[in-house]
């Protein structure tokens, strides 16, 4: 991080960058999913090697479970910014903060999305990049990169929590 940034800004940017990368490495899940992610039975039964959850956006319409393998880069980020693994606890409690109601939690997720966007954009600008990334990029990049790598469409759809007979995944491919 640039030397001229104060310590608090560097720490906040590091946390935001971690959440940004977690969204990509987490099968392109969104920040609401990250906020709600818990250290559940699956996490411990997998030997702390994967997360399992139902997407927040579709939980009322679908019970499709998403499984996220914890690959080494994701584990590195978890070691730096996630809460310690305690059964039933949130992985990223800082997203919700002290918000208790669903409305307050949605507001906190929206605020954290804005924080991530602001901090990551300032970081890439300091590196001389001309792009303006957002959290949406994570989902689109996940789908696009897997497609370019030749991963079957059904696998990508399942990984993203979409039904395999749906065309929703196509909306995320090559858009970014």
Annotate each PLM feature.
Residues 1, 71-130:
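Active-site/catalytic core of tyrosine-dependent DNA strand-transfer enzymes
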Residues 1-31, 35:
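Basic, Lys/Arg- and aromatic-enriched nucleic-acid-binding interface segment
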Residues 4-11, 87, 117-158, 162:
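Short, basic (Lys/Arg/His-rich) helix/loop patches that form interaction surfaces
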Residues 6-10, 56-69, 103-112, 129-137, ...:
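Short, contiguous acidic/charged loop-to-helix segments that flank catalytic cores in large enzymes
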Residues 28, 40, 80-84, 148, ...:
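Short, well-ordered loop/turn and helix-capping segments at boundaries between secondary-structure elements
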Residues 30-34, 143, 168:
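Extended, hydrophobic alpha-helical segments in both membrane/secreted and soluble proteins
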Residues 36-80:
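Conserved tyrosine-mediated DNA breakage-rejoining catalytic core shared by Y-recombinases
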Residues 55-59, 160-176:
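Catalytic-site neighborhood detector that most strongly recognizes the C-terminal catalytic loop/helix
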């Amino acid at each position: 991080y640039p030397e001229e940034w104060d310590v608090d800004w560097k720490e906040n940017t590091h946390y935001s960058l971690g959440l940004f990368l977690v969204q990509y490495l987490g099968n392109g899940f969104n920040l609401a999913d990250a906020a709600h992610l818990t250290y559940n039975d699956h996490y411990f039964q997998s030997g702390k090697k994967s997360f399992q959850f139902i997407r927040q956006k579709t939980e009322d319409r679908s019970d499709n479970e998403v499984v996220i393998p914890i690959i080494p880069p994701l584990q590195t980020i978890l070691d730096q910014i996630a809460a310690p693994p305690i059964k039933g606890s949130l992985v990223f409690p800082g997203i919700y903060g002290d918000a208790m109601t669903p409305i307050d939690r949605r507001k906190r997720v929206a605020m954290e999305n804005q924080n991530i966007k602001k901090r990551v954009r300032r970081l890439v600008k300091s590196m001389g990049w001309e792009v303006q990334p957002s959290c949406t990029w994570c989902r689109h990049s996940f789908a696009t990169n897997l497609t370019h790598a030749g991963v079957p469409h059904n696998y990508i759809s399942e990984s993203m929590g979409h039904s395999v007979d749906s065309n929703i995944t196509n909306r995320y491919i090559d858009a970014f």
